[in-house]
Amino acid sequence: MKLNNLEFFFVNSPIRAYIQERYELPLLMNMLTSKAFDSVLEIGCGNGNGTKLIKKYFNPIHITAIDLDEKMIQIAKRTVQDETTAFKVMDSSTLDFPNESFDAIFDFGIIHHIPNWKDCIGELRRVLKNGGKLVLAEFSIDTFSGFPGRLYRSMLSHPYEQMFSTEEFVQYLERVGFKIDDFKKSNPLKIMPHFLLVASVPSKAHEKTDTAGTENHTADFQHSDFR
C-alpha cells in the first residue's frame, strides 16, 4: 500500500529521521543480544534513512532494501550510495528471494500498511535463516484507537479494517514459528504509541531441545504488555 501525500511528507521529514535514530534504534539495539549480521533485508525502506542507520550501527556485509513504491526506491538510492546495498521494488507479502536468505530482517513501520499482513509475516519467516532475527518497530490498530488515534484515521490512508492489534500480531508471529526475544511499548514525543519487538527463528538444535516451542511463549508476557 503506497503512502498518501501527508504520509509521504512525514516519512521524509526530519522528525521521522530523528525518532528513528534517537529513539527506535537505541532501544532496538539494547534488545538484541547479538548485532553481527552478514545479510540483512529491510522491508518498506522508504527514503533509505532506515537503511542508512542499519549500515551505520550494524554494518552488515550486505543489505537488501525493498519498497513497493518505485519513487521511494529512487529517493533511497540517492540517500545510500554504497556497493554493499541493493534497492529493489518489491511487495513485502510476495518476496522474490530463496528460503533462508537473510540473517536479519528490519521493519520500521511498514507491516501495518499491508492488508494481507499475515502473508507478509509468512514470507519473512520463509526467507529468514534458522537463528535469524526479526527486528521491528510497528504500529497497530491500538495506535489508531481513542484520542488522538481517531484523528490520525481521518488523515492517514491505512487498511484499518484488516489491521492487527498488538496482541494479535505477536501471537501470529509465534504461530508461524517465531520466538519472541523482547518486546517494548514506545511513544516518543507522545504523539503516536507503537511497539518495538525482536523475534528469532529458533535454530535446529534449539528446536530439538525445546519441544514447547512457540505455542506457550506468549505466556511469558502479560496481556497488558500488548495494550
Language-model features, listed with the residues they occupy:
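Core SAM-dependent methyltransferase catalytic element
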Residues: 182-213, 221, 226-227
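Class I SAM-dependent methyltransferase SAM/SAH-binding core
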Residues: 41, 47-94
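Short N-terminal helix/helix-N-cap motif within the alpha/beta-hydrolase-1
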Residues: 71, 115-119
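Conserved class I S-adenosyl-L-methionine
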Residues: 1-34, 49, 53, 72
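C-terminal alpha-helical "lid/dimerization" subdomain adjacent to the S-adenosyl-L-methionine
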Residues: 15-21, 135-195
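Short catalytic micro-motifs in class I SAM-dependent methyltransferases
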Residues: 109-113
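A short glycine-rich, Lys/Arg-flanked "PGG" loop and its adjoining helix->strand segment in the class I
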Residues: 118-130
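A conserved beta-strand element that flanks and buttresses the S-adenosyl-L-methionine
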Residues: 106
